[in-house]
């Protein structure tokens, strides 16, 4: 006698899906320690190059000089204003890119006709350097906060779209067959199977997008702003005041490390399936 739906559900629940091995806390600690070793090693090499004259002090400040300058610069209201403008622009553009990238990419990956229609368009646009769109964006929106957010958004968008497409296309067929066996609609399977299965792909795309977004905000502030860390770096570098410029560069690097570490933590904490 064939098993009822309730019995099938109980059997599946009792058996469970195979679990992927979790990342043990010792492995995370190992990665953290060696990551710190890598950063410290780079700083030591930087200081050694500055001390031995390999790096011209006119163009490359030493880490110690950058640290001394940072202690004086960070409490400055003017510098904090630049930092706030860049942070605001970066997080706005990146957040909008995340939402739009997922909302566009998942349906394209889920529906074969949409995939066949839009995949060549995405590949063509993605192949164009996003800096090439800078004059067009300036013509459309002028020079201001809106144009800078659009540059950050455009810089970060396509890795999220592409990874969302791959996530939707890479769903295990066994999961879909289980959903169909319980008469789940396409929309229900999309919400309960495709979307959760795509989260690791989306987070991988977000890690790539973070670096592109930071580059985008700096380039936008180079050409389209009188505020922000990008403007500050350009201003100080043109005046050959390299220590303050390197303070801003290090802060941007710390932004990237912090955001990527946050995404990695979320992935390790919630995506171990």
Model-assigned labels for residue ranges:
Residues 1-40, 261-273:
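Transmembrane alpha-helical segments of polytopic membrane transport and secretion proteins
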Residues 16-28, 51-96:
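Periplasmic/extracellular loop-to-transmembrane helix junction in inner-membrane transport proteins
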Residues 92-122:
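Transmembrane-helix boundary motif in ABC transporter permease subunits
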Residues 123-159, 166-167:
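Generic hydrophobic transmembrane alpha-helix motif, especially the helices
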Residues 230-265:
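Hydrophobic alpha-helical transmembrane segments of polytopic membrane proteins
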């Amino acid at each position: 006698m064939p098993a009822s739906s309730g019995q099938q559900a109980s059997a599946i629940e009792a058996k469970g899906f195979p679990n992927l091995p979790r990342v043990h806390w010792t492995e995370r600690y190992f990665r953290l320690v060696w990551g710190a070793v890598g950063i410290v090693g780079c700083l030591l090499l930087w200081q050694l190059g500055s001390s031995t004259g390999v790096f011209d002090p006119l163009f490359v400040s030493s880490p110690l000089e950058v640290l001394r300058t940072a202690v004086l610069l960070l409490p400055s209201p003017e510098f904090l204003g630049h930092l706030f403008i860049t942070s605001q622009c970066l997080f706005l553009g990146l957040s909008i890119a995340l939402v739009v990238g997922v909302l566009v990419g998942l349906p394209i990956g889920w529906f074969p006709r949409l995939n066949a229609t839009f995949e060549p368009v995405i590949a063509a646009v993605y192949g164009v350097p996003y800096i090439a769109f800078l004059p067009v964006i300036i013509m459309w929106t002028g020079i201001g906060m809106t144009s800078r957010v659009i540059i950050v958004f455009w810089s970060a968008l396509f890795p999220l779209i592409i990874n969302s497409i791959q996530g939707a296309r890479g769903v295990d067929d066994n999961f879909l067959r289980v959903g169909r066996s319980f008469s789940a609609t396409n929309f229900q399977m999309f919400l309960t199977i495709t979307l959760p299965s795509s989260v690791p792909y989306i987070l991988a795309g977000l890690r790539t997008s973070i670096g592109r977004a930071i580059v985008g905000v700096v380039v936008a502030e180079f050409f389209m702003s009188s505020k922000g860390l990008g403007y500050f770096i350009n201003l100080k570098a043109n005046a050959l005041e390299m220590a303050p410029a390197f303070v801003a560069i290090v802060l941007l690097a710390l932004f990237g490390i912090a955001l990527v570490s946050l995404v990695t933590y979320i992935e390790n904490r919630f995506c171990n399936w």
